[in-house]
Amino acid sequence: MLAESYPWFDPAHVTVLPFGAAEADFAAARSHRPAAPLIDFDDGCQHFVYAGRGGAVMAFALRALFRAFQLYLENNPADARRMRFHFIGTDYAPPPLGRECALPLARELGIEKFVTEQCERVPYFDALHYLQRADAVLAIGSDDPGYSASKIYPCILARRPLLLVYHEKSPVLDFARRVSAGTAFSFADARDHEELARRILAGWFGNPMRRLQEGHDETAFRPFTAAALTTRLAEVFEQAAAVARTSSHR
């Protein structure tokens, strides 16, 4: 795009770097405690946590997740009644203007007592605390195939069991497979949530071992850490400086 607008612009000299995953933040978050905790992790329940923006674009994936839980509740009530779903910081609007995206869908299915939603944003280290303490982390995607959530890094670095529900063409799924993170369920279009729900039911709720599976391929993930990408950025600056020095001597 820039090359089309500026004839002097050379795309060959462009390097695109993603944001790095800040492992040091998680080390610091281990000793952090929210001033007003939203979740009681010691109440004997299983707490599944989603932290980040929500919205109508996530309705299909959320509806499938909640439908899967509804079916599990019908067939395995003793286990399902101990499960809690928490959605934190789902809207950018300041209080009291936040708009719920998860609770309305839960109400449609009659499972709202198992779901909490905090629309307002929370401090960064509070969010990391909730992810680290969760029995499982939820990574719920948009029905937009091009959607790539930057929050996938914290979801992985929490090193907790991870459930991903994304469009099959989302870059997030490719990345999760590359680093062997989580249990993923994909969909091709946002029409048949019932079929997706039954896959989530069988592969996640009905598979306790999957719900205990945590971690990822540390070696495959290393190039995406803040330390590795800072090194890469320094290399880019060195290359740019070398080009400038060469040009100045011509």
Language-model features and meaning:
Residues 114, 129-145:
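Acidic donor-binding loop of glycosyltransferase active sites
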Residues 1-13:
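A short, active-site helix/loop in glycosyltransferases that binds the activated sugar's phosphate group
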